[in-house]
């Protein structure tokens, strides 16, 4: 599934959601879209976001895995988390990516 969001400067960030071996609900896709677009407030140069969702081991409680890869100008960032819900895993990923984007932005500014 491909979702595109328009930014203030008319630059489009592409959000690609891939659910492996299941169909993601519209509610889950809307949640992911909302969380990923919030990452733009930490760094302007996000070009593309690739979100991968999969069930790791059905017999355990923490079996929902989410991975988010952000393509940004001059590099990329990646986070992967496992939780008992996809929402929790996506939350963990976006929290980790916020920190990465802040560090990346500071690194660029210091050059």
Question: Where are the language model's segments positioned?
Answer:
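N-terminal, polar/charged subdomain of small-to-medium soluble alpha/beta proteins
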Residues: 2-111
């Amino acid at each position: 599934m491909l979702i595109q969001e328009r930014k203030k400067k008319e630059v489009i960030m592409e959000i690609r959601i891939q659910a492996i071996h299941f169909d993601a609900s519209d509610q889950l896709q809307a949640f992911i879209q909302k969380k990923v677009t919030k990452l733009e407030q930490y760094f302007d140069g996000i070009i593309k976001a690739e979100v991968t969702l999969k069930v790791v081991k059905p017999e355990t409680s923490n079996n929902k895995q989410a991975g988010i890869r952000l393509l940004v100008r001059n590099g990329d960032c990646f986070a992967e988390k496992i939780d008992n819900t996809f929402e929790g895993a996506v939350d963990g990923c976006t929290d980790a990516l916020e920190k990465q984007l802040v560090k990346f932005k500071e690194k660029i500014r210091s050059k």
